[in-house]
Amino acid sequence: MPVKIPDNLPAAEILESENIFVMSETRAANQDIRPMKVLILNLMPNKIETETQLLRLLGNTPLQVDVDLLRIHDKVSKHTSIDHMNNFYRDFEAVRHKNYDGLIITGAPLGQIEFEEVTYWDHIREIIDWSQHHVTSVLFLCWAAHAALYHLYGLQRKLLSAKRSGVFNHQRTHKHFPLLRGFDDEFFAPHSRFAEMEVADLKAHKELQVLAESDEAGAYLVLSRNNRNLFVMGHPEYQKSTLKDEYQRDLAEGLNPRVPKNYFRGDDPSQAPVARWHGHGSLLVSNWLNYYVYQLTPYDLHDMSAITPWEHEYKDAEDND
C-alpha cells in the first residue's frame, strides 16, 4: 500500500522513480480507507534527504500511511529552504491536540553535546512526554533513542573516543517477538554516532528488552515492555551513499575521520560502498508499522485508551534454540 504525502513534496519524484508506491493527498481523499497516521519529527540537517529515506521505508509496507512532518522550531535551516519548511512542516502547537498511530523521531548531529545543553532539549522532552499519551507507538532513531532512554528511564550514555561509523553485524537475542519476524539470526545495520548505551544497563532495566545487539556496535534494538517505544540505535533508513557523504564531509572539515567499517568494498574508501542493510531496514519498519502500530492502535484515534497490548507471551519469550 502507498504512503500518502503532501502534494508536490520533492521526495515524491525520487520515490516514484524507484518504484516506491506514493499517493498524493488529492488522490487519497477519494479512497475510503483508514490509513495509519504517522508523524515524523525530523531533526536531521538535510530535511529532504531524511524525508526521502523514511518515506522510502514507509512506502514499502503493506499499509496505507498518512504522514505529517513536524519541525522542532521555526528557525532557518542551513540545508533546507524556509519555503520547504513552511510548506510541508508543522509546528508542535498545530498537532498537540491530535493523536497519531505512530511517531518517528530521527537522529540528530548532536552526539557530543550533553542533552541539557541542546538548545531545543525542553522541546524534545515535551514531545516525548506528549507522545506517551497521544501516540500508539514511537520509533526513536539513533540520537533520539539515546535522548529518550535518558529522559524516560534515566539511563546515561557513554561518549566514545571516536565516531562509530560503519555497517556492523548484529544478532537477534530473542526470536518470539513480532518485531523480529522474518529476521535472519544475523543481519547488518549502519551506525554513525559518538556515543552508546551500555548493553548491561539496558538489560538490567525492568521496563526494557534488548532484542538485537552487535559485538562491535553494542545494543541495536531495544523495546519497552509495554511495546509502545522502540529504540533503534543505528540508521536502518540510510541510503547507500549516506555514510560516504558523511565521511567525505568530515574529511573536508579536517576532522580526520576513521573510514566507515565494513562499508566500502575492501574497506577502501576509493572503492564503491556496498549496501547490505536495505532488506533488514525495510523489514524492521514494516514489522514495526504492522505489529506495533496497526495491530495495537484503536480504530478511533480519539480514544487512546483502546490500545490493545500484545499478549504476555510476546513480552518475555526467550530464544532458547
Swiss-Prot record:
One of the protein's GO biological processes: L-methionine biosynthetic process from homoserine via O-succinyl-L-homoserine and cystathionine
A molecular-function term among this protein's GO annotations: homoserine O-acetyltransferase activity
Catalytic activity, EC: 2.3.1.46
Binding site residues for substrate: K163, S192, R249
Keyword Cell division: no
Keyword Cytoplasm part of the UniProt annotation: yes
Recorded catalytic activity of this chain's protein: L-homoserine + succinyl-CoA = O-succinyl-L-homoserine + CoA
Pfam families: HTS
UniProt pathway annotation: Amino-acid biosynthesis; L-methionine biosynthesis via de novo pathway; O-succinyl-L-homoserine from L-homoserine: step 1/1
Function comment: Transfers a succinyl group from succinyl-CoA to L-homoserine, forming succinyl-L-homoserine.
Protein name, UniProt field: Homoserine O-succinyltransferase
Organism for this UniProt entry: Shewanella loihica (strain ATCC BAA-1088 / PV-4)
Gene designation per UniProt: metAS
